[in-house]
Amino acid sequence: MQSVINTVKGKALEVAEYLTPVLKESKFKETGVITPEEFLAAGDHLVHHCPTWQWSAGEESKIKPYLPNDKQFLMTKNVPCYKRCKQMEYSDEQEAIIEEDDGDGGWVDTFHHSLTGVTEAVKEITLETQDCGKTTSNIAVDDDDDDDEGEAADMEDYEESGLLDNDDATVDTSKIKEACKPKADLGGEDAILQTRTYDLYITYDKYYQTPRLWLFGYDEQRRPLTVENMYEDISQDHVKKTVTIENHPHLPPPPMCSVHPCRHAEVMKKIIETVAEGGGELGVHMYLLIFLKFVQAVIPTIEYDYTRHFTM
């Protein structure tokens, strides 16, 4: 039943997107949405710091006129996925419902309680230009702890954990790393047999005026995964609600998994406000870097490329 509802909603949104005018004036600071030009700037910034991500044109017949022909969307391919979500060690105590009154039951932040420290005032947020090929991250007041690598925090944790509210505290990502630790040694034969790969894409959604993530998976022999197979690699709290199956706007079938963008602008707006309260300013060019941390809560076992360090 939920799949039927999602299909109907998807068709309605296709029409709505077609009728929605292209956003021309920046409203990033006020509402968290971005223009196509701002999407391009954020995409260029991502490609510069994380070169496994690249711009792509897609099918000529599906080119969007408000984006350059050779920069229709971003993609990264052959991203490893070593374990299924059910093999991760987490419990209900680690979850928190975000926005309970949204009519859909709220957004479940699976590792909400894994972060144990926050920072008070932010003068600026800058990206450390370090190796982005590794999928570990540190969010800290400085970069003295280069050897202390842990899993990245997701975007909701920035706002819900009271990011930037306490004195001289460092976000401890080591607990997230421990929470996501597979039950079996990744070096074992069983782990190798279970390794999958994913192609990830980031498009600009004209209706929601935000980025949107798409993913499609393959097994060990590079054979396409079924929808049910891909659902095994997605947090079960998000399957068929936050994550739906839809056609990629720039590529031919088959349909792909997509992380619905209806909450992205709202969450980004809260982060912008939090940073501003600390005396800092969040540049729109950082959008996709934060976005990739945000969606990690939805696909925690897919080890895509994101920045290692944010200096607060």
From Swiss-Prot:
UniProt-listed GO biological process terms: autophagosome assembly; autophagy; mitochondrial fragmentation involved in apoptotic process; protein transport
Span list, region Disordered: 136-156
Active site residues of this protein: 262
Database matches in Pfam families: Autophagy_act_C
Motif, Membrane-curvature-sensing motif: chain positions: 4-19
Keywords of this entry: Autophagy, Cytoplasm, Isopeptide bond, Protein transport, Transferase, Transport, Ubl conjugation, Ubl conjugation pathway
UniProt modification remark: Conjugated to ATG12 at Lys-241. ATG12-conjugation plays a role in regulation of mitochondrial homeostasis and cell death, while it is not involved in phosphatidylethanolamine-conjugation to ATG8-like proteins and autophagy.
A cellular component annotation (GO) from this entry: cytoplasm
Protein EC: 2.3.2.-
Cross-link (Glycyl lysine isopeptide (Lys-Gly) (interchain with G-Cter in ATG12)): 241
Compartment list: Cytoplasm
A GO term for molecular function: Atg12 transferase activity
Chain location of the short sequence motif LIR motif per the record: 104-110
Family: Belongs to the ATG3 family.
Domain notes: The N-terminal region works in concert with its geometry-selective amphipathic helix (AH) to promote LC3-PE conjugation activity only on the target membrane. The LC3 interacting regions (LIR) motif mediates interaction with GABARAP and MAP1LC3A in a beta-sheet conformation-dependent manner. The LIR motif is required for LC3 lipidation and ATG3~LC3 thioester formation.
Subunit field text: Homdimer. Interacts with ATG7; this interaction forms an E1-E2 complex that is essential for the transfer of GABARAP thioester from ATG7 to ATG3 and disrupts interaction with the E3 enzyme complex. Interacts with ATG12; this interaction is ATG7-dependent, essential for phosphatidylethanolamine (PE)-conjugated ATG8-like proteins formation and also mediates the autoconjugation of ATG12 on ATG3. Interacts with the E3 enzyme complex composed of 4 sets of ATG12-ATG5 and ATG16L1 (400 kDa); this interaction disrupts interaction with ATG7 and promotes ATG8-like proteins lipidation.
Protein known as: Ubiquitin-like-conjugating enzyme ATG3
Lineage: Eukaryota, Metazoa, Chordata, Craniata, Vertebrata
